[in-house]
Amino acid sequence: MAVGLLGTKLGMTQIFEEESGLAIPVTVVQAGPCTITQIKTAETDGYSAIQIGYLEVKEKALTKPELGHLKKVEASPLRHLKEYRVDDTATYTLGEAVKADIFNAGDLVDIAGTSMGRGFAGYQKRHNFKRGSMTHGSKNHRLPGSTGAGTTPGRVYPGKKMAGQYGAVKTTTRHLQVVRVDAERNLLLIKGAVPGKPGGLLNITPAKIVGK
């Protein structure tokens, strides 16, 4: 697995292609800068990986174990830590900054985040059920319909699509294209939408291509 970045979703806008003039919807992501806080090797940990930290905060926002872990490498208090497996750790050093310039325009990335929470939602909003007739004496407008058989099995099977909590779960959108990289401000312009609300934490990794 290649090293990725932690970032923050800032919002959406659009840019225009110079040649065709087409408008491209893009999400602006604050990608890093992240700090390498730990390097794991096969000799000491059984596998090779690097750990990065993101989002500097006040010391009181972290626990003493977290502060002690970061002080070992003389890193600032960082809110989020994330580990990425790598084939070779020799090219990385403790305290090194990982920035948005690890990606280039045209790269494909996978972005994981927490989807927007929509609270307790019904059948139509949560599962796209078709509603009943609104006229002709129908009393079945937004009801679910049948939830299963009768005496046998005498219960509703687990996993039945019903009303409930919608959103606020970890989700990944795959194979999104990096349209533009602003290395000075550590910004990525990603084509299309990414999970979550503005201000949400994102995990940005090179896209996993099947067969490669």
From Swiss-Prot:
<feature type="region of interest" description="Disordered">
    <location>
        <begin position="133"/>
        <end position="156"/>
    </location>
</feature>
<keyword id="KW-0694">RNA-binding</keyword>
<dbReference type="InterPro" id="IPR009000">
    <property type="entry name" value="Transl_B-barrel_sf"/>
</dbReference>
<dbReference type="InterPro" id="IPR000597">
    <property type="entry name" value="Ribosomal_uL3"/>
</dbReference>
<dbReference type="GO" id="GO:0003735">
    <property type="term" value="F:structural constituent of ribosome"/>
</dbReference>
<dbReference type="GO" id="GO:0019843">
    <property type="term" value="F:rRNA binding"/>
</dbReference>
<comment type="similarity">
    <text>Belongs to the universal ribosomal protein uL3 family.</text>
</comment>
<dbReference type="GO" id="GO:0022625">
    <property type="term" value="C:cytosolic large ribosomal subunit"/>
</dbReference>
<dbReference type="InterPro" id="IPR019926">
    <property type="entry name" value="Ribosomal_uL3_CS"/>
</dbReference>
<keyword id="KW-0689">Ribosomal protein</keyword>
<comment type="subunit">
    <text>Part of the 50S ribosomal subunit. Forms a cluster with proteins L14 and L19.</text>
</comment>
<dbReference type="GO" id="GO:0006412">
    <property type="term" value="P:translation"/>
</dbReference>
<keyword id="KW-0699">rRNA-binding</keyword>
<comment type="function">
    <text>One of the primary rRNA binding proteins, it binds directly near the 3'-end of the 23S rRNA, where it nucleates assembly of the 50S subunit.</text>
</comment>
<protein>
    <recommendedName>
        <fullName>Large ribosomal subunit protein uL3</fullName>
    </recommendedName>
</protein>
<dbReference type="InterPro" id="IPR019927">
    <property type="entry name" value="Ribosomal_uL3_bac/org-type"/>
</dbReference>
<keyword id="KW-0687">Ribonucleoprotein</keyword>
<dbReference type="Pfam" id="PF00297">
    <property type="entry name" value="Ribosomal_L3"/>
</dbReference>
